[in-house]
């Protein structure tokens, strides 16, 4: 299901009028088009079909850390900006390293809750690799929390893990490895 850009443009014009703006003034004339194009780009994840190639691997933990992402909060349609860290223990094959960031992009290109995003990435990595041993940690600043309401710049951290990552020592090993790539160090 694609984006109905005509309907978005009409709705944006109505919102502009509702907040007391003139949608025909110079700075706003193309805003409905810009918003429609932006929403089309930021919500096309359901159409993303990541192709996986499996390669010979090992049984050692594979980690891709510091994958930057942005997504829209489904409650306020405002951005979340953050990083994702992914680990899995291959059963015997690995996927191409670029596929993990592609999985993150796929699920971040839709209206999201951070906790759901984290689980979706974990489940897709598990499915793509055939591994039941996966851990994902996402950290994000929610602009809906930063610019309205509580006005706090505190990041939200969410984790999803399964299989061997239920062992706290393996989780700690993962967390220790990704420390240099954590949000507070990575986005500054």
Swiss-Prot record:
It catalyses: GTP + H2O = 7,8-dihydroneopterin 3'-triphosphate + formate + H(+). Pathway: Cofactor biosynthesis; 7,8-dihydroneopterin triphosphate biosynthesis; 7,8-dihydroneopterin triphosphate from GTP: step 1/1. It is an enzyme of class 3 (hydrolase). One of its GO terms (molecular function) is zinc ion binding. Homomer. InterPro entries: GTP-CH-I_C/QueF, GTP-CH-I_N, GTP_CycHdrlase_I, GTP_CycHdrlase_I_dom. Keywords: GTP-binding, Hydrolase, Metal-binding, Nucleotide-binding, One-carbon metabolism, Zinc. Belongs to the GTP cyclohydrolase I family. PANTHER family: GTP CYCLOHYDROLASE 1 (PTHR11109:SF7), GTP CYCLOHYDROLASE I (PTHR11109). Its EC number is 3.5.4.16. One of its GO terms (biological process) is one-carbon metabolic process. Pfam families: GTP_cyclohydroI. GO terms for cellular component: cytoplasm. This is GTP cyclohydrolase 1. Gene3D superfamilies: 1.10.286.10, 3.30.1130.10. Zn(2+) binds at residues 73, 76, 144.
């Amino acid at each position: 299901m694609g984006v109905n850009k005509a309907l978005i443009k009409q709705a944006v014009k109505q919102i502009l009028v509702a907040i007391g703006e003139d949608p025909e003034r110079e700075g706003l004339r193309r805003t409905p088009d810009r918003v429609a194009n932006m929403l089309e780009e930021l919500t096309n994840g359901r159409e993303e079909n990541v192709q996986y190639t499996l390669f010979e691997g090992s049984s050692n933990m594979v980690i891709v850390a510091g994958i930057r992402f942005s997504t829209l909060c489904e409650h306020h349609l405002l951005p979340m900006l953050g990083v994702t860290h992914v680990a899995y223990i291959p059963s015997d094959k690995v996927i191409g390293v670029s596929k993990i960031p592609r999985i993150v992009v796929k699920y971040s290109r839709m209206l999201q809750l951070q906790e759901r995003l984290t689980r979706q990435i974990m489940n897709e990595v598990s499915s793509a690799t055939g591994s039941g041993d996966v851990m994902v940690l996402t950290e994000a600043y929610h602009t809906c929390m930063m610019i309205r309401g509580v006005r706090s710049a505190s990041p939200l951290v969410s984790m999803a893990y399964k299989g061997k990552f239920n062992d706290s020592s393996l989780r700690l090993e993962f967390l220790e490895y990704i420390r240099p790539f954590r949000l507070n160090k990575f986005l500054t």
